[in-house]
């Protein structure tokens, strides 16, 4: 889960390893700063998992954008409509499943009772473990935009969000 990325990556580079870390690199700006500092300190190669960069249709699209055939690009907007999200029903806390070492799964996250909603895939929708759709899918949309413009940082950012659907479900 995302909440482990910082600790695992720092431990790995401290052990002299090069690292492939899945996106998002960290759960906070501070975690990302710690990770970048560790990679520099231990002179490790670190790659962040942006899998779409390896897809041929993505490379073809970037080649087209970079060809100049679109003219001068003045504005880039990135968004995603997610039609696969489903309501997460409220469930009571439960016993930890057999074979799961829940304390190790929690790791650096705050200690909370086990709840099936905050485990496996759905951990993404709980702040203790991840950053919701922005860090799960938004990082890819921003990556497309930045590569398309051949920049590493945006000039400005505007974001809007909220819990507009399923107001009574269990997601945070």
Give the positions of each predicted feature:
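Beta-strand-loop-alpha-helix segment that lines the small-molecule cofactor/substrate pocket
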Residues: 2, 6-54, 68
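Short, solvent-exposed loop/turn and secondary-structure capping segments
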Residues: 6-11, 31-32, 58-59, 86-91, ...
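Structural recognition of the beta-strand scaffold that forms the well-ordered cores
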Residues: 19-21, 27, 45-48, 74-78, ...
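Active-site-proximal cap/loop segments of hydrolase catalytic domains
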Residues: 29-32, 38, 58, 119-122, ...
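Basic phosphate/pyrophosphate-binding loop/patch that engages nucleotide-derived ligands
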Residues: 37-44, 60-75, 93-96
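Core domains of carbohydrate- and sulfate-ester-processing enzymes
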Residues: 77-119
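Rossmann-like dinucleotide-binding domain that binds NAD(P)(H)
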Residues: 103-172
